[in-house]
């Protein structure tokens, strides 16, 4: 299982631009990304396989177009739950906090891509341990935290 793409943007609701490496900051997120900060969606994940399925349906999309920070290959995000932990590269650790999200309006991503799969297939987390990660680094599940997941408002979030 590996990281296929890392992407960042300066503004929320827009496609992200791929870069080769990035620094994850504990309790903050990805250095230089619009979604960084003291909240539960500091980092977003999407399976590369999901992007490939969107392409097969005729969408003209590539890594970063759905505003995902990290596209992965071989990670089965369909069975992950809030509280799961994910190790990225040699040192970084992210706790999954939310599965999917609500989109209240169609953003630039929807209009550019013709669909947005992040509300259905995106996975979000917060950085527990920082570190520098690179495209091509390994990624793996690393256990579960003590929190429990619940479903609220059409999305699954952490509860304390």
Residue ranges of model-derived segments:
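Metal-cofactor-dependent catalytic cores
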Residues: 1-160
């Amino acid at each position: 299982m590996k990281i296929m793409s890392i992407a960042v943007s300066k503004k929320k609701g827009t496609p992200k631009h791929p870069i080769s490496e990035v620094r994850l900051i504990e309790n903050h997120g990805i250095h230089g990304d619009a979604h960084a900060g003291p909240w539960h969606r500091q980092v977003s994940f999407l399976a590369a396989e999901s992007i490939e399925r969107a392409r097969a349906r005729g969408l003209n999309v590539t890594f970063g177009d759905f505003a995902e920070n990290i596209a992965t290959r071989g990670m089965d995000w369909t069975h992950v739950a809030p509280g799961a932990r994910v190790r990225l590269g040699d040192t970084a650790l992210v706790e999954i906090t939310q599965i999917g999200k609500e989109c209240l309006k169609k953003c630039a991503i929807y209009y550019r891509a013709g669909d947005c799969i992040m509300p259905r297939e995106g996975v979000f987390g917060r950085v527990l341990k920082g570190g520098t990660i690179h495209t091509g680094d390994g990624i793996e599940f690393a256990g579960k935290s003590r929190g429990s997941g619940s479903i609220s408002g059409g999305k699954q979030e952490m509860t304390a």
